[in-house]
Swiss-Prot record:
SUPFAM superfamilies for the chain: Thiolase-like (SSF53901)
Name of protein: Acetyl-CoA acetyltransferase 2
Coiled coil: none
Record-level GO cellular component terms: peroxisome; plasma membrane; plastid
Alphabetized CDD domains for the sequence: thiolase
Record localization: Cytoplasm; Peroxisome
Tissue expression remark: Expressed in root tips, emerging leaves, young leaves, stems, and anthers at the microspore stage.
Source domain of life: Eukaryota
Main enzyme class: transferase
Entry annotated with the keyword Ribosomal protein: no
Residue numbers binding K(+): A254, V355
Length: 403
């Protein structure tokens, strides 16, 4: 691990600490905690691991998608809850599923521009705590029944342009690239198997900050330190699930889509100059990044546009990339992008992904960067790329160089 002047230039963006909570299942182990609390836990742990005093932080940029009823300025709540001073600037980012990664990109840009030297970035989501809305109540509910709007569906999982769920877009992708139900189920089973193997080998231990959850009413509190989704795997059952979005000939199911979940992830970024000055251990550098967008209903394959942009921005060739994390919004997303980019399956999501681990919307973009860092460390890789699609037709991608 290097923090020598030869390997780090003054304006390099250096990752010096990372942490994430376990991914809690929908209405599961972490559902008693708001996203902001999960965010605080991840930030505090990342700073502690980085050996960076919270008082040195100049800015916090944090992703969050389902902000209704979280209270004002969620990123600020997460930061102050982690002991970061009142004088620190905080901004919440909403780029749907790419929020956590976009937050890291914005933080990196501020370091490259010389505006900041120490920034905390990441993302958080508690899908379990997303409220349902009485959308018409403010105008006066004069007569008859009122209907509830599901905030999670409306603001997180619905294509407003075509008035359909994200899963319907996944079906469109499966149709376009001729990806069968069996292929998607095989991929989903592989995601669980890889995730379980990684968990058993302790590959996630260095990523995770254990979360203490109050038992309430005098009952003892429990410690949550494992990704909850991995404990619910049943391959035979997964293959028998009914399609969720298309009755006739549908291929996308609850089993081969990402699971609704709760979690937070944080990264501490510093300039090369600051890393040398403070004698910090540099885990990796951010080499490049890129965003892309296309038709909203084809958000599924936007990573295939963003990933080459990020690799080019890093001044690399795709042949130099050792490992990829492509967020598994749906099994079909990982399969289609692998196909479009010509990537060998053994280089992608080697520790499982959102299908098995969970996909807390605002968190996932940051979570996959932390997982990617662990994979590069464990498998002696040098360059890794994280890519994540987002609702509305977009995607973000980022290149890491392990030191």
């Amino acid at each position: 691990m290097a923090h020598t002047s030869e390997s780090v230039n003054p304006r390099d963006v250096c990752i010096v600490g990372v942490a994430r909570t376990p991914m809690g299942g929908f209405l599961g182990s972490l559902s008693s905690l708001p996203a902001t609390k999960l965010g605080s836990l991840a930030i505090a742990a990342a700073l502690k691991r980085a050996n960076v005093d919270p008082a040195l932080v100049q800015e916090v940029v944090f992703g969050n998608v389902l902000s209704a009823n979280l209270g004002q300025a969620p990123a600020r709540q997460a930061a102050l809850g982690a002991g970061i001073p009142n004088s620190v600037i905080c901004t919440t980012v909403n780029k749907v599923c790419a929020s956590g990664m976009k937050a890291v990109m914005i933080a990196a840009q501020s370091i490259q521009l010389g505006i900041n030297d120490v920034v905390v970035a990441g993302g958080m989501e508690s899908m379990s705590n997303t409220p349902k809305y009485l959308a018409e109540a403010r105008k006066g509910s004069r007569f008859g029944h009122d209907s509830l709007v599901d905030g999670m569906l409306k603001d997180g999982l619905w294509d407003v342009y075509n008035d359909c769920g994200m899963g319907s877009c996944a079906e469109l992708c499966a149709e376009k690239f001729q990806i069968t139900r069996e292929q998607q189920d095989d991929y989903a089973v592989q995601s669980f198997e890889r995730g379980i193997a990684a968990q058993e080998a302790g590959a996630f231990t260095w990523e995770i900050v254990p979360v203490e959850v109050s038992g309430g009413r005098g009952r003892p509190s429990t410690i949550v330190d494992k990704d909850e989704g991995l404990g619910k795997f049943d391959a035979a059952k997964l293959r028998k699930l009914r399609p969720s979005f298309k009755e006739n000939g549908g291929t996308v199911t609850a089993g081969n889509a990402s699971s609704i979940s709760d979690g937070a992830a944080a990264l501490v970024l510093v300039s090369g100059e600051k890393a040398l000055q403070l004698g910090l251990l540099v885990l990796a550098k951010i080499k490049g990044y890129g965003d892309a967008a296309q038709e909203p209903e084809f958000f599924t394959t936007a990573p295939a546009l963003a990933i080459p942009k990020a690799i080019a921005h890093a001044g690399l060739e795709s042949s130099q990339v050792d490992y990829y994390e492509i967020n598994e919004a749906f099994a079909v997303v990982a399969l289609a992008n692998q196909k479009l980019l010509g990537i060998a399956p053994e280089k992608v999501n080697v520790n499982g992904g959102a299908v098995s681990l969970g996909h807390p919307l605002g968190c996932s973009g940051a979570r996959i960067l932390i997982t990617l860092l662990g994979i590069l460390k464990k498998r002696n890789g040098k360059y890794g790329v994280g890519g994540v699609c987002n609702g509305g037709g977009g995607a973000s991608a980022l290149v890491l160089e392990l030191l």
